[in-house]
Design a protein with these regions (language model features):
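Extreme N-terminal, non-catalytic leader segments
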Residues: 1-49, 93
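Walker A/P-loop phosphate-binding motif and the immediately C-terminal alpha-helix
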Residues: 42-80
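Phosphate-binding loop that captures ATP/GTP phosphates
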Residues: 72, 77-155, 170
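Glycine-rich phosphate-binding loops of nucleotide-dependent enzymes
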Residues: 149, 173, 192, 205, ...
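Cytosolic-facing regulatory segments adjacent to core modules
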Residues: 150, 155-197
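Conserved catalytic-core segment of NTP-binding enzymes
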Residues: 179-182, 186-291
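C-terminal boundary of histidine-terminating zinc-finger modules
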Residues: 295-306
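Short, hydrophobic alpha-helical segments
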Residues: 316-325
Length: 325
């Protein structure tokens, strides 16, 4: 059975790594490269600060891609607010997640096990499989087939804040990326922690050949200033493909469907032009989106006639056209 240790990145005295730790790290790098090589396109979703709807955007883009027929995964790397599973209607903490791991592994073994073999050989086969998957963490699949991996699955209570030191956080993020067993995917969407600290940086460093870094902002100036810092960090890492989505840009009245641009119009576009990054459109404030974390699922796939769902389909089409063709 795959083991999921939570002892992330403990170094020897004085920050020096023992040969054993160096070996483990190299093996992790190899697993990471192998895992990511099976994924065609990677989209990292970022924001300068929390509260701009970054996770909602990431979850909806993943759902939209999956609904369009692409094999898609979403990695919720936001350690402090891992709320993607909740948005997708997955209620699973550490205990249930460990059971899920066991069930998936059992299924894998049973699929390939030749029961006509002598018992001894069957046992050997199972041991081999255990070895093969000892580091694998299997993402949870939603009804639509979207694969989901989140920090939320590795904690025993959602009420308990995750209090870790820096190296433990980056170690945990790295483990999620290297050990999640995605299989072949067309798209992996990564919901990055907000800001420009070690955690978002770890994600960018761990994922080579990111096809797109998607910045989520809102019309207020502070949100834009924070995004500017993020854009500079991404550019320093030599990632050229950066797109911007302006979330909560206008209001749709739930009663008459009238569109109200309460913050003025065209802010996001002007901001993206100024930073010389690609503007991918705006999204409204809408009652159903604001409620979505408590609802059972994100909105886009639930209601294909919905204005917001249509916007996500347009945004995904633009992403494909601008960055992937």
């Amino acid at each position: 059975m795959p083991e999921h240790g939570h002892g992330h990145g403990h170094h020897g005295h004085g920050g020096q790594m023992t040969p054993e730790q160096q070996m483990q790290m190299m093996q992790q790098e190899i697993r990471l490269a192998k895992n990511l090589s099976q994924i065609k396109h990677k989209i990292v979703v970022m924001s300068g600060k929390g509260g701009v709807g970054k996770s909602t955007v990431a979850a909806n883009i993943a759902e939209t891609l999956q609904a369009m027929g692409y094999k898609t995964g979403i990695l919720d790397a936001d350690i402090h607010g891992p709320n993607v599973p909740k948005m997708l209607g997955i209620e699973m903490l550490e205990e249930q997640f460990n059971q899920y791991q066991f069930d998936v592994f059992k299924e894998l073994v049973e699929k390939d096990l030749d029961t006509s073999l002598p018992e001894e050989e069957q046992r050997e086969f199972i041991e081999e499989k255990k070895k093969e998957y000892q580091h694998s963490i299997f993402p949870v699949e939603t009804e639509s087939g979207l694969k989901v991996m989140s920090m939320a699955f590795l904690i025993d209570s959602l009420d308990r804040p995750i209090i870790w030191r820096g190296p433990q956080k980056t170690g945990a993020i790295k483990q999620l990326i290297s050990d999640a067993h995605w299989g072949k995917l067309d798209f992996l969407v990564i919901d990055n922690p907000p800001g420009t600290g070690d955690e978002p940086l770890t994600v960018l460093q761990s994922i080579p050949e990111t096809d797109l870094v998607l910045m989520v902002t809102t019309p207020n100036v502070v949100s834009q200033e924070d995004v500017l810092k993020c854009v500079k960090m991404v550019e320093m890492m030599n990632i050229k493909n950066i797109g911007l989505i302006e979330n909560m840009a206008y209001y749709i009245c739930p009663h008459c469907d009238e569109t109200l641009h309460i913050f003025g119009e065209g802010n996001g576009k002007a901001f993206a032009d100024e930073m010389e990054i690609t503007y991918l459109g705006d999204l409204p404030i809408k009652e159903s989106v604001a409620e979505s974390p408590t609802k059972d699922a994100t909105i886009s796939v639930l209601d294909p006639d919905d204005e917001v769902s249509k916007r996500f389909v347009e945004i995904v089409e633009d992403i494909k056209k601008e960055f992937l063709e």
